[in-house]
């Protein structure tokens, strides 16, 4: 029997059709943001029966800090809204980690980045930003992060067509990254057993977003914010709210308590964790562990307590600081 030309063509096409494409191996940069591990600090809580102290190790993000989460969401929302359009420069004020995240994303996705930051940020942060090709405008170290904010606002107002002003201190995409990501990860990783959430305030996005979602999941979770104990401190990225420009996304009513941490206590905890736990933590991360221990020591012991703090970054960006070698 002679087959029609159309049937022959169909048979040939079926026999020689390309096989379905397999999923591509590997992951993109964005795929690696989030889902960071929880690390136990059993060495520090041996004298506290029933207490589990956990730190969310945010240096496992590709940019090395918790700020990858907010930066990626801010960039995504900027593109979606059309504000970060082709040819525009992303502009923001930063104490370092968010800037590193912006610079990393800009290099990967092809948009230029200009950052305003205090001159006295760690040497390691400056080198990382240069390696990513970001344009840096340094501000007076005495003005802290507020000086960088004022500079960024001035540039954005003067050149609105040139810049997409990301404004992490006011951008709702900042805290929403933690509402949808960080909080749900913590809930799942602790199997809903978390009793306390403790972290340092900077932009306040991590605390705001994570606390809002955790309170929805279990209103009895105690959410405790941390601040430096004075306007002049050495905890990079942290804000002393009473003397600083208060971020628009910050709502103090969300905290069940607020604890002040001295720079010296954070430094001492950096050293202790390095020598007793084998982890090099950033200064604000160590401040979180210090405060978490203080909270745990004041609780009624014997019942299960699960405290989670955010380890914002590792100590690698601070190794040029002198406190590591102090006794």
Protein language model annotation of sequence segments:
Residues 1-327:
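PLP-dependent amino-acid enzyme catalytic core
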């Amino acid at each position: 029997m002679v087959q029609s030309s159309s049937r022959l063509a169909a048979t040939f096409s079926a026999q020689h059709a390309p096989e379905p494409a397999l999923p591509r191996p590997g992951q993109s940069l964005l795929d690696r943001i989030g889902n960071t591990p929880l690390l136990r600090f059993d060495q520090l809580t041996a004298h506290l029966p029933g207490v589990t102290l956990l730190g969310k190790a945010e240096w496992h993000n590709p940019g090395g800090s918790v700020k990858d989460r907010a930066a990626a969401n801010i960039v995504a929302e900027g593109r979606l809204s059309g504000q970060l359009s082709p040819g525009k420069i992303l502009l923001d004020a930063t104490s370092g980690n968010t800037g590193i995240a912006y610079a990393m994303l800009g290099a990967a996705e092809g948009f230029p980045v200009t950052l305003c930051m205090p001159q006295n940020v760690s040497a390691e942060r400056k080198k990382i930003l240069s390696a990513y090709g970001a344009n840096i405008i340094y501000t007076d170290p005495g003005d802290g992060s507020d000086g960088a904010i004022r500079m960024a606002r001035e540039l954005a107002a003067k050149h609105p067509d040139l810049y997409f002003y990301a404004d992490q201190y006011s951008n709702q995409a900042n805290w929403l990254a933690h509402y949808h990501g960080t909080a749900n990860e913590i809930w799942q990783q602790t199997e809903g057993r978390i009793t306390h959430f403790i972290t340092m305030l900077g932009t306040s996005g991590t605390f705001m977003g994570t606390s809002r979602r955790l309170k929805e999941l279990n209103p009895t979770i105690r959410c405790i914010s941390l601040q430096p104990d004075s306007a002049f401190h050495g905890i990079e990225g942290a804000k002393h709210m009473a003397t600083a420009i208060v971020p628009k996304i910050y709502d103090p009513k969300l905290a069940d308590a607020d604890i002040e941490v001295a720079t010296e206590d954070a430094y001492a905890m950096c050293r202790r964790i390095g020598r007793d736990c084998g982890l090099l933590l950033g200064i604000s991360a160590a401040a979180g562990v210090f405060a978490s221990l203080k909270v745990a020591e004041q609780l009624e012991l014997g019942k299960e307590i699960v405290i989670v703090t955010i380890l914002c970054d590792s100590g690698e960006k601070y190794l040029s600081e002198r406190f590591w070698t102090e006794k």
